[in-house]
Amino acid sequence: MHPLVEKHRSELKALALRHGLRDVHVFGSMAREDARADSDVDLLVDVPPGTSAFVLGAMLMDAQDLLGRRVDIVTRSSLNPVLRERVLREAQRL
């Protein structure tokens, strides 16, 4: 896991809990530790049924403020079937 994510791991988990999200993982270059200075942070989350898109938007903005980088949030149910296996294989739980 990239040092930036590791440094803010507990804060990211707290943000997720505050927004009612669970089982948060990092994937992509930040999980593989081949991120560049301009790489974004990819987060995979499980959302309870009925969760509003506003909740994901709030989590996204809070995570970007915390990390000082662009963040992408993907729900497990919305994973692209073509990429699903790779994402799940490399995902690391926060």
What are the residue ranges of the model-derived segments?
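Catalytic core of pol beta-like nucleotidyltransferases
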Residues: M1-H25, A31-A37, P48-L94
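Conserved G/P- and acidic residue-centered "switch" motifs that form tight phosphate/ATP-binding loops
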Residues: G28, D42
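Short hydrophobic/aromatic beta-strand micro-patches
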Residues: L44-D46
